[in-house]
Amino acid sequence: MNSIVNITPIIIILSEHSSEHTFGFNSDIFEANVINILLLLFGLIYVLKQSLGSTLNERQLKVLAAIQESEERLEQASSRLSESEKQLAQTQIIINQIKKEAQLTAEKVRSSILAQGQIDIERLAITGKSNIETAEKQIRRQIQQQIAFLALKKVTLQLENQMSSDIQLRIIDNNIAKLGDQL
């Protein structure tokens, strides 16, 4: 309102100056609707400021929620990874124990074989080797299963983190197209 009071002397000067040069300027503020235009302009600025402010606040809240959700998923993935690493370490310990036990068993078998004679040595050596191979095969199988399990778990975690809806739709469309070709 203070700016309107400051504008009034300028308008009066312009109207006096314009009357000398045949340029018409209406100095009556009420007749020229200057107040209405200013009120409309200030109202429009106020409404737009509130509208844009609330929109920006909503967008900020959405971004913060998305960041928080991503951080939670990262924490979950990290805890799963550390758990998998612990399981792998435990598996390595078990493998080492089994190897030590196999070595101890082999040494005991060798001692008893030497005491019983050459014939028993050959027979027990064959049996011992067979047992060791079987144990190694089982251990290898268990290790392979554990490694495959951990690898699948890691790949699953990576797929869950990287798989977007666009990729899923492309995979589904590709499979549908393949089925259509087969029919």
Swiss-Prot record:
GO cellular component: chloroplast thylakoid membrane; proton-transporting ATP synthase complex
Entry's family note: Belongs to the ATPase B chain family.
Main subcellular location: plastid
PANTHER family reported in the protein's UniProt record: ATP SYNTHASE SUBUNIT B, CHLOROPLASTIC
Subunit text: F-type ATPases have 2 components, F(1) - the catalytic core - and F(0) - the membrane proton channel. F(1) has five subunits: alpha(3), beta(3), gamma(1), delta(1), epsilon(1). F(0) has four main subunits: a(1), b(1), b'(1) and c(10-14). The alpha and beta chains form an alternating ring which encloses part of the gamma chain. F(1) is attached to F(0) by a central stalk formed by the gamma and epsilon chains, while a peripheral stalk is formed by the delta, b and b' chains.
Record's keyword terms, sorted: ATP synthesis, ATP-binding, CF(0), Chloroplast, Hydrogen ion transport, Ion transport, Membrane, Nucleotide-binding, Plastid, Thylakoid, Transmembrane, Transmembrane helix, Transport
Superkingdom as given in the UniProt entry: Eukaryota
Compartment annotation: Plastid, Chloroplast thylakoid membrane
UniProt-recorded name of the protein: ATP synthase subunit b, chloroplastic
Listed HAMAP family: ATP_synth_b_bprime (MF_01398)
Job of this protein: F(1)F(0) ATP synthase produces ATP from ADP in the presence of a proton or sodium gradient. F-type ATPases consist of two structural domains, F(1) containing the extramembraneous catalytic core and F(0) containing the membrane proton channel, linked together by a central stalk and a peripheral stalk. During catalysis, ATP synthesis in the catalytic domain of F(1) is coupled via a rotary mechanism of the central stalk subunits to proton translocation. Component of the F(0) channel, it forms part of the peripheral stalk, linking F(1) to F(0).
Topology in the lipid bilayer: Single-pass membrane protein
Pfam families in the cross-refs: ATP-synt_B
UniProt xrefs under CDD domains: ATP-synt_Fo_b
Source species taxonomy: Eukaryota, Rhodophyta, Bangiophyceae, Bangiales, Bangiaceae
Gene that encodes it: atpF
Stretches that traverse the bilayer: 28-48
Note, other: In plastids the F-type ATPase is also known as CF(1)CF(0).
GO molecular function, one term: proton-transporting ATP synthase activity, rotational mechanism
